Each structure stands twice: as structure tokens, then as C-alpha cells.
Regions:
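Protease-domain processing segments flanking chymotrypsin-fold serine proteases, especially trypsin-like
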Residues: 3-12, 16-56, 106, 171-174, ...
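Conserved catalytic-core segment of clan PA serine endopeptidases
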Residues: 21-36, 50, 75-137
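Extracellular/periplasmic catalytic domains that process cell-envelope and extracellular macromolecules
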Residues: 34-37, 47, 55-56, 75-78, ...
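Catalytic histidine site
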Residues: 37-83
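Short conserved beta-strand and strand-loop elements enriched in small hydrophobics
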Residues: 42-44, 79-89, 155-161
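Active-site substrate-binding loop(s) of clan PA
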Residues: 54, 71-73, 109-122, 129-165
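Catalytic nucleophile loop of clan PA
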Residues: 54-55, 192-216
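Short beta->alpha transition motifs characteristic of CBS
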Residues: 64-67, 213-222
């Protein structure tokens, strides 16, 4: 496996990738009917911008870890300041939910606490966040996607996202592929990405069903994108959120003993 020596993560590199966008033909979902089958992909709105996210459970949204940190200060966003808007389209959405809490890998959180930013290949490998919604999304509104195991280079993939210049509509880049698997389980793709594409699901088709292979972490001006391998990280974060939910609620007059 090759070592990803210096991948510029998050918004810094995605700004450069915006120049490559003009080379790519996106399937822009201009009408509500175009969203059929993609209802579980949505826009994650935060105090200072937005990312793309996707449901992987009735009350779980998958996105990139750097989306839940302020890019200027490196401080984590409060969950109450985030809203997931499934199937967002020109100001409306199929449904929307506030975020109740979120979790990122310990290694990513430690790096942000120490340096205020993450710019290494290892950072891309842990650039995953799982968000617990305040209320679940019903099956009548959107069906969550499942996470796929890591494929081999050459596997065809597609990226579904919001982005700069297409903030109000969901778009799909239908024709890119896995180009490389690097050290730390970082995956490379020949997909063009830009601001807002952070956290966008990278889809692979398995037995005629779409599965999420990765999420967009970063990209460059050459039309290359990078993202982490998901299964182990998503499992870890899901378990952590479940443990937190199982803790006794602290009420007035009571004190939690840890």
C-alpha cells in the first residue's frame, strides 16, 4: 500500500478542487422527482456553513469529522447548532431533524485538541463523524443506506453531494472509481469535489443495491478525492453513541458518579 504523504484535508484542499469541477458533468437533481432513491442524503447545516451527510440508521447520520469542528478556531460545534435536512431542495426538505449528539474517533478528537487542525494522511483515515438525531426518521420519509466493505482499486463509484455553486440541489457524479488504497486505510478516488462536498457519501453498487463505501474527506486540483474506510470506524462510533444513550439521565438533585 502506498503512503499518503501529505493530503490537505477538509476545506483547505477542497477549495483548490473547485477549479477541477468544471471538467466534470454532474447529474443535478433539479426536480423533486429526481430525488427518488436519494432521500436519505441531505445537507448538514452548521453555524458557519454546511456539509453533506447520509442516513445510516433511522436516527444516525454519517458525515466527515472535520464538519463538526469550526474551521477557524478548531473548536467542536455544539450538537444543538446543527440540523440535518434530508433531501434538501431549494429551501425545503423531505424531513429535517436537529442533531442531539455526535461522536468522532478518539484519534481525530485528540489531534484537534492538540493542534486545532488535522492535515495528515492518518487524519483522513479517521475523518468520520456519526451524528445522533433528536428524533428518528420514519421509513415513509427516507430509508437509510448500509455501509460497504472496502473494495479493490478499479471499482466504480459515485458521489452524491451538495457543493459550492449547487448549494440548493443535490448532485451526483456518476462516473468515477477507486484509484488506490493507501496506508491507514485511506481510499483514493478520481472524483471532483468542492466546498460542501465534505462528508458526501461515496456509493458502490452491490447486488443492485447502493452501499456507502466512504465519505469525502479532502480533494485536490487534479480531480482526486480521498476518504476513509468505514466499517470499523462506524461500528466503533455507533457503539459509543449507544453507550452514551444507555447512561442514566442526570436530573435535578442527582449527581452522576463516574
Amino acid at each position: 500500500m502506498k503512503y499518503l504523504a501529505a493530503v490537505g484535508i477538509a476545506l483547505a484542499s477542497l477549495s483548490a478542487a473547485a477549479h477541477a469541477q468544471s471538467r466534470t458533468v454532474f447529474d443535478v437533481m433539479e426536480s423533486r422527482g429526481d430525488l427518488l432513491g436519494w432521500e436519505a442524503v441531505g445537507r448538514l447545516d452548521m453555524p458557519h456553513g454546511f456539509c453533506t451527510g447520509a442516513l445510516v440508521g433511522r436516527d444516525l447520520v454519517l458525515t466527515a469529522a472535520h464538519c463538526v469542528f469550526d474551521p477557524d478556531t478548531g473548536q467542536p460545534y455544539a450538537a444543538r447548532g446543527m440540523t440535518f435536512r434530508a433531501g434538501y431542495h431549494h429551501g425545503g426538505s423531505i424531513t429535517e431533524r436537529p442533531v442531539a449528539r455526535w461522536a468522532v474517533p478518539d484519534r481525530y478528537a485528540a489531534g484537534m485538541a492538540e493542534a486545532g487542525s488535522m492535515t495528515s494522511g492518518e487524519a483522513v483515515a479517521t475523518d468520520v463523524a456519526l451524528l445522533r438525531l433528536a428524533q428518528p426518521v420514519s421509513s415513509a420519509e427516507a430509508d437509510p443506506f448500509r455501509v460497504h466493505e472496502t473494495p479493490s482499486p478499479g471499482t466504480r463509484v459515485s458521489v452524491v453531494s451538495y457543493g459550492r455553486g449547487r448549494e440548493e440541489v443535490l448532485s451526483r457524479e456518476p462516473d468515477c472509481e477507486v484509484t488506490q488504497r493507501y496506508r491507514h486505510d485511506v481510499l483514493g478516488f478520481d472524483c471532483d469535489v468542492t466546498f460542501g462536498s465534505s462528508g458526501a457519501p461515496v456509493f458502490v453498487r452491490e447486488n443492485d443495491r447502493l452501499r456507502i463505501l466512504s465519505v469525502i474527506s479532502s480533494g485536490n486540483a487534479r480531480g482526486e478525492a480521498y476518504g476513509p474506510s468505514l466499517p470499523a470506524l462506524v461500528s466503533e462510533l455507533r457503539q459509543r453513541l449507544n453507550r452514551e444513550d444507555a447512561r442514566p439521565k442526570v436530573t435535578t438533585g442527582a449527581r452522576r458518579i463516574t
